[in-house]
Every structure is written in C-alpha cells, then in structure tokens.
C-alpha cells in the first residue's frame, strides 16, 4: 500500500509593517512601533494614521482641512491645532440598523476643522459602570489603510475605534448563517453553518484609514490561496473580503473530528447490538468498544465545536490574543477600614530653639504643659 504525503506550508511569525494589508503571507503582529511624539499637522488632502507604543495602545491621526474624523466617545486624549477652528459633535452612525441586529450602538466624536490638525486617540473603550466593571485585558490598535483594492468585515462589535477618509464607506450587515454553494463544493460538504454570530458585522470599503482595537495584542494571519486557517471565533477581529456578501464564501463552522464521528458511529453500533441482546449475554469484549466510543466522543467533540471556524484564502484575518474570559473583571469595593481616633498629640506641636538657633519640633497633648516647661527653663 502506498502512503501519500502532502506538503504543508509552514506558518511563520514575524514583525508586521505599520499598516495591515489584505494580501496573503505569514502570521505577523500589527503593528509594533515605538512611541513617538504627536506628528505636526501638514497640509494636504490625505489623512495619515499611525499607531504608537509597544503594544500600540495610542493612535495618532493627522487630518487635512474639511475632512471629518470619527473617534469613539471617550477615547480622545489630545488635539493638536487651533481649537477655535475645530468643530466637535457626537454622532451615532447607523444606530437604527445596529439596534435591529442586536449590535452595540456606539457613539463617536466627529471632529472637523478649516485647517490641518492632529488627534491622539486611546485604544481603551469607555465603560458604562467604571466603578463596578473594568477591563482586565488591555487593548491595542491595528491600523488599516484602505486604497479601494480590498474591503474589510469587522466582526468585533466594539473594535471600530477611529476612522476617516475622503471616500470611506461604512455599513452594517447581518452575518450569513450558511456557507455558499461554491464554498460547499470546494469543501466537499453540504451548506453547513458559517459559525458567525447573528449580531452582524460592520463592512468597511473605499479609501481611508481605520484603527481597530482588540483585546491584548492584534496579529495579522495571512491565508494564501487554496489554504485554510482554523481559528477561534472569539479571537477574530476582522476579515478581508471582496464585497459585503463575501463572508459566506470564506468562513465555515468547524465540524467534529473524524475520531469523534467514528466514536459516535461505534457507540451507535454497539448500542444497537446491545438492544438486540440481553444484558446477561454481554461479554467484556463487547463492553470495551462501547466505552471506548463514548470516551472518544466526549473527548473529541469539544475539541472542534461551534467555537472554531475555518477561513479559506486568499485573505487576511486579524486576531486578538485576549480571551473572552479575560475581557471583563468585576471589582467589588470592600468596606473602608476604620482609622484610629486622633488625639491632641497628633496635631499639636511645639517648636523650640536651642542656643545654636536650631529648631526642635515635638508633639504635645497640652499647650499649658509646654508653656510651664518653658517657664521653668528661664
């Protein structure tokens, strides 16, 4: 019997460029730049976005005149420019569509000016109850530069932090629940579920810059053509797509492993055989395969459950390293410890000078006692 071997392209990890692209390649971090000063605004018609820090937790946006920039509410750290020339307003883009899909209705601060200015934004998102709930995992930026050749589907509901551009278009769509026929034929399967949540996603296209925030560090996994990448659904921040209806052509829910299927089939066969015979007729050699099949099903089924999806290339997937169980941490303020009551000696002090005119400070419980002691020294 001949054994066929298949070559598998290794997945390399290396430093990523400043901006993430949609071309296939290796697994890289997005981005890892050293913290620098806020760049001075320069005239022009192009908006510039730069992620700062390691990991990048701050984004600097240089905005030309008459071009609005949208920053998530509560994320603006500093503004460089003449404040009297900058107009600020709070908006909620596509709030009705997001509300119908069960998505997060985020408010953004819209900044526009008659002359160039720069904005410094933070990757942290505001919390509704900061005294009770705080984020346990820090957030970092992944900067995207769109030139019209590739679009992005932002799956994380709170990932869109900053966006601006002369021809940047944003829209909210419902996530497809079944894969396309073309993907089903390539996978040699039926139209299985995509594994995506029903809350929808934000489709970004056109020309401009976008800063996405993820928990932990954000990495770019570039999947080449005719290749697949199995990832946890909770770690996906965004996927590069070709149009607003391309997700069902590249994302499929990960089915159970073959070992799990074999185990379930073996357990079903054993169960059918056991029903046709009495329990007293069962032998040890019949019980062992049944127990082995049940154990294989219990162990293998959770390995590739509904929490994993397969992404088919060519495309780029942005992944966050922070797990879902680490995103929130409840903090309960305990009762304040009662401090000891203060006595008069804690806040009554007497200052005396010796013959060398050096001051001496000492505490006293009664000024009368200190005065009598001074009188005795005269």
Swiss-Prot record:
InterPro entries: AIM24 (IPR002838), AIM24_sf (IPR036983)
Example GO BP: inner mitochondrial membrane organization
Pfam families noted in UniProt: AIM24
An annotated GO cellular component: mitochondrial inner membrane
Keywords: Mitochondrion, Transit peptide
Gene3D superfamilies reported for this sequence: Mitochondrial biogenesis AIM24
Transit peptide feature range: 1-50
Intracellular or extracellular location(s): Mitochondrion
First-listed, main subcellular location of the protein, grouped into a coarse class: mitochondrion
Coiled-coil portions: none
Domain of life where this protein originates: Eukaryota
Family per record: Belongs to the AIM24 family.
PANTHER family per record: ALTERED INHERITANCE OF MITOCHONDRIA PROTEIN 24, MITOCHONDRIAL
Protein name, entry field: Altered inheritance of mitochondria protein 24, mitochondrial
Origin organism lineage: Eukaryota, Fungi, Dikarya, Ascomycota, Saccharomycotina
């Amino acid at each position: 019997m001949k054994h066929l071997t298949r070559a598998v392209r290794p997945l390399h990890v290396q430093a990523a460029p400043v901006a993430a692209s949609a071309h296939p390649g290796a697994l890289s971090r997005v981005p890892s730049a050293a913290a620098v000063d806020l760049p001075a605004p320069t005239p022009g018609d192009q908006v510039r976005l730069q992620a700062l820090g390691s990991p990048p937790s701050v984004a600097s946006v240089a905005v030309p005149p008459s071009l609005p920039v949208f920053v998530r509410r509560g994320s603006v750290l500093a503004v460089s420019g003449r404040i009297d020339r900058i107009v600020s307003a709070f908006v909620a883009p596509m709030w009705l569509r997001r509300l119908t899909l069960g998505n997060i209705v985020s408010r953004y601060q819209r900044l526009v000016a008659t002359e160039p200015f720069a904005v410094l934004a933070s990757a942290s998102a505001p919390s509704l109850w900061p005294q009770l709930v705080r984020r346990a995992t820090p957030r970092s930026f992944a900067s995207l530069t769109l030139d019209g050749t590739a679009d992005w589907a932002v799956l994380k509901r709170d990932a869109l932090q900053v966006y601006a551009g002369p021809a940047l278009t944003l829209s909210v769509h419902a996530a497809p629940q079944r894969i396309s026929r073309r993907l089903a034929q390539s996978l040699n399967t039926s139209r299985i579920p995509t594994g995506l949540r029903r809350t929808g996603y934000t489709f970004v296209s056109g020309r401009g810059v976008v800063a996405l925030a993820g928990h932990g560090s954000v990495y770019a996994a570039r999947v080449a053509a005719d290749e697949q990448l199995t990832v946890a659904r909770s770690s996906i921040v965004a996927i590069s797509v070709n149009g607003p209806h391309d997700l069902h052509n590249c994302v499929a829910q990960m089915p159970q492993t073959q070992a799990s299927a074999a185990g379930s089939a073996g357990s079903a066969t054993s169960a059918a055989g056991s029903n046709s015979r009495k329990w007293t007729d069962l032998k040890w050699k019949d019980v062992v395969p049944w127990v082995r099949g049940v154990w294989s099903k219990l162990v293998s089924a959770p390995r590739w459950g509904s929490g994993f999806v397969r992404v088919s290339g060519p495309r780029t997937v942005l992944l966050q390293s922070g797990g879902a169980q680490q995103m929130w941490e409840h903090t309960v303020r305990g009762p304040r410890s009662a401090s000891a009551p203060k006595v008069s000696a804690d806040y009554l002090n007497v200052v005396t000078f010796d013959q060398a005119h050096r001051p001496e400070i000492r505490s006293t419980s009664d000024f009368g006692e200190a005065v009598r002691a001074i009188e005795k020294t005269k």
